Amino acid sequence: MNTIPLTLDAYKPTYTVLGGGRGSGCRDGFPVSVLLLNRGPMLYRAEMIQELVRVGFESIVSMELIGDSPELEGLASRYPQVRFICLHEAANLGVRVNIGMRESCSPFVFVLWNDQRLATSTLSSRFFDKVVDLDAACLVPTLNDATGSPVPSISHPAQSGKAFRVVPLPPKADGEKSLYPFDACGIYSREKFMLLGGFDWTIGNPYWQKLDFGMRAWLWGETIRYAQALRLNYDGAPPAEDTTPDADYGRFWFKNLA
């Protein structure tokens, strides 16, 4: 069983940074910064950023799509808290998260997507104290679809004969363990993420990429836990997980189960 994680520095695609200044928005009193991932239409980009700033986040890294709109320069001037990362080449989910973690400055990084909304307009200082106290590699949120129904986002390992299976269920109890962060969403300990080697950029399928990270965290004695107070709502349907046993599954299997 291969438990040696890749380092985040093993692959560094080129990119341009617009706005902000590395570490300029972080201060000791607010331990969480934001990593905003983007997909699909960008109709409400400005509103999303404004909402995050209004909640109180002082440092936001936005991972942009290739060939993104010219409005970025205007947004960068309006929101000095935001640094826009413009990749020069296509990159899978893990690569984008790895870059965002390197570019973030806080000890904890809240990863979410542009098609999600915070279900609360404020996050209390008590909640951030809990983030520190739980000492988890990642705290995953309650996820609801556009109708308000809970997404089965908590993953549990199961065994069927000699086969390894993952069973997704809706969250039940605060602090409940999950095998991996659904849709890569959650509040990550930046230090633990770095020590674990981040996401394996050689695994292109996001499902096996996230599962590989979760298995590695477990093998290294770290935990991924559900935080009931953290809630996100999807604007539309949540993304479907592609669990096809493809070549990426083969790499995951050899690294974690062989």
Please state what every model-predicted region is:
Residues 219-258:
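Active-site-adjacent helix/loop segment of glycosyltransferases
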Residues 87-104:
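Glycine-rich, basic loop-to-helix element that forms the pyrophosphate-binding segment
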Residues 1-50:
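N-proximal low-complexity "stem/linker" segments adjacent to membrane-targeting elements
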Residues 117, 121-155:
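Conserved donor NDP-sugar-binding/catalytic core segment of glycosyltransferases
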Residues 157-179:
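Short, flexible, basic/aromatic active-site loop/helix in glycosyltransferases
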Residues 50-59:
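Short, acidic, metal-binding catalytic loop of nucleotide-sugar glycosyltransferases
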Residues 180-188, 192-197, 203-230:
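A short, conserved alpha-helix in the catalytic core of glycosyltransferases
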Residues 107-117:
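Short beta-strand-to-loop acidic/aromatic patch adjacent to the donor-nucleotide binding site
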